[in-house]
Amino acid sequence: MNESIFLSAFNAKTMTFDEVASSFCPSKKYEELAGGWNALLIGPRGSGKTTLMKMLSLQGMRAWPADKLITRPEITYTGIFVPADIAWSEMVSALTRDAFDSRLGDLVAETAFVTNVLLSAIRTIELRVSRAASAPEFQSVTLTGSTHDEWIVHAAELWGLKPQSLSLRALTRALEARLINFRQEVRFIALQHAEFDEAQLRERIPYLGLSLIESVSQSLISFNQAVGETDHKWALLLDEFEVAPLSLQSTVLRALRGGAPELLLKVALAPCGPHTTLAEDPITGPSERNDFRQVLLWYPDRGDAEKFCEDVCRTWLAKKDPDYAALPLKEVFGTTPIAIVEDDDSEDNKVEDEPTRQKRLHETSKLFISLAEKDPSFKEFLVRRGIDPFNLAASDDVYARATIRKIAPIVAFRNAYRSNGTVGKKRGRKPYVAAYVGWGSIAAMSEGNPRWLIGMLISIWTGRYKDSGLPIPRAAQTDAARETGGAFVEMLRSLATRPTQGAEVGEPVLNIVEKLAKYFHDRLVTESFVEDPPMVFVVDSAISSAVEESLRLALNHGAIICYQGPDKSGGYDSLRGRKFRLAFLLAQQFKLPIRKSKEISLSTALNSGVLAQPGLSEMSVPSANNSATKVNATTGDKPVQDTFPW
C-alpha cells in the first residue's frame, strides 16, 4: 500500500454526501458534536472530522439511509457545511510577501473566507426551498411571491451583490462570479508587489471587509422571518479550519462567545494548529462548557474505541462480504495469541473457564521456560517473585496471577527477539507477527481512526485467499498491518519537508519517532528484565523548542497519542508536562507491543545510546538443586525454593 492509497482510503473530503452517509457509523463523539451548542472538533489527520461535519449538514441529514440501524438524530438547526479552501492561506502568503501590509492581507483573506461561507449558505438555502413544493424533505420550507423577492433584495444588499434576477439561483451565480473575480484581483495585486494602499484596494474590491458573523447571521435571521421560522437556528460547519489564516481563526474563535444566538459555530481543528498561538483573555474570551464544547477525536486507552471500530468494521463488511457482517469479529479475524494486557485488568481478563485457563498457563509456561533459559535477568525475576514456570498453576492460584498475566506479552516479545546464550543480544529482524493478528490487535492499531481501520480491512481482503475460511489467515492480517503501517511511516517521512503553517521543524518527525521506538524496543528486549518497561513518554523541560515543534506535527498527523486533553480552546499551547505514546499503528514497524506502560522523560529516551543488558545483579541466583534463596523482605518479593530444572 503506497502513501497515496493510504491517505485516500475512505477520505470523506472527496466523497459525496450520499457516499459518506451510506458508510457512516454514529458514535458518542458524533452525539457530543451534534448538540445545539457551539463546538470545537479536534483531531489528527484522518480521524473523521470531515465525515462528522458532513453528517451534520442539511445534505448529510437528507442522505441518512432509511434502513440504517441507528435513526437520524433530532437536529433542530440547519447545518451549513463549509469545506476547507487552501486558497485562503495562499492568498495571504502571496500578498504579505514583498512587504505588502499584513493588515490588508488579513482583510483580503477574510473577504475570501466570507465569500466561501456565503456561497455555502445560499446553496443550503436553495436546498431547503427548491423541493418544498413537490415532495417535502427534511427541513424543507416554502418561500414564494413578494416575500421571496423581498428576501432576495435584502440578501443582495447585505452581501453587496447585483444579481441578474430575483432568484436564489441568481444569488448563487453572483457569488460564484464574485469568487472568480476576487481571485483574479488578488493575483493582479500580488504581481504589483507593495504598490497598493487600502484605498486603492477597496476601489478594486468594493466588497472588501464584509463582516463574517454579521453578513451570515443577518441574512439567515431575515430568511427565518421570511419563511415563518423566527426561532430557527443555523450552524456553520467549518471543516479543516487550521488551514485558514490566523486572523480568520481568531475572528471565529472569539465569536464563540457573544456571537449571534441564531448562528452556532462548529469548527474542526488540528490539535496543534496555528490557532493555539493566539492569546486568550480569561475574562472576556470564550470558555469550555460555558460557550462551547470540545470534542476530541482520539482514544488514549484502546478500549474506548473498540465499540466504534466494531461498528465501522461491520458496516464495511456488510458491503464487502455480507455473510461475515453478522458474525462475531473474533470469529472472522481470530484472537491475538498473546493477550494485550493494559495497566488495569478488565473484567474480561479476570474471568475465564478452567480449560481456557489451563491452555493459557500451558502456553505461558513454555514462553517463561524458553526465556529463562537464555535470559538470566528473567530467571532472577521469577525467583524473586516466587513464580515457578514449570508449575504456573500454583503461582496463578495463590498470589502471582496478575503478574503472570501482565508480563506474558512482554515475555513473548523478549523471547522472540533475544538470541540464545548471548547477554543482551537481539536476533533477526523479522517482527514478532503473532502480536499483530486478531480482532483485538486490528482494532487497537486503528486507534479508532476510520481511515486507518478501513485501509487495513481493504488490505486484508485484498491479500486473503478467497476460500481460505475463518478466521482469516494470519498472513493476510500481518501483511495488512505491515503495509498500512509502512504507508503511514512514509507519510511521516514526508513531513520533514511539509511543516505546519508558520512552523520551523528542527528535526524530521520520523527521526524522533524512530529514536523513541528504538529506545522502547531496547528497554523491552536488551536491558535487564522488568515487568513494566516504559512505553509512554513525558515531554520534559529539557526538550528543545525545535523538538517540541516536531512533536506538534506528529500529533497533528496521529503519530503520537496524548493522554491529557488540550490546555486551551481548540488545541495545545504547549506539550510540556504531557504524557504521550506512539500510535499503535507503528507497533509492527518498530517491533513494539500494543500496550501502554510506565512513563519515561522524553529527553532520557532521545539522549539514550545503545542499551545493553548489564550483568546479573549482586543478588545470588542459585542453580537448580541449591537451597532456598533469601530475598530482601522490604521489597515485597516472596521467597521461594529454587528447584527450577534449568
Regions inferred by a protein language model and the residue ranges of each:
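P-loop NTPase nucleotide-binding core
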Residues: 54-222, 285-393, 451
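A short beta-strand-to-loop transition that corresponds to the Sensor-1 phosphate-sensing loop
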Residues: 56, 268-273, 450
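Conserved Walker B catalytic segment
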Residues: 199-269, 280-282, 571
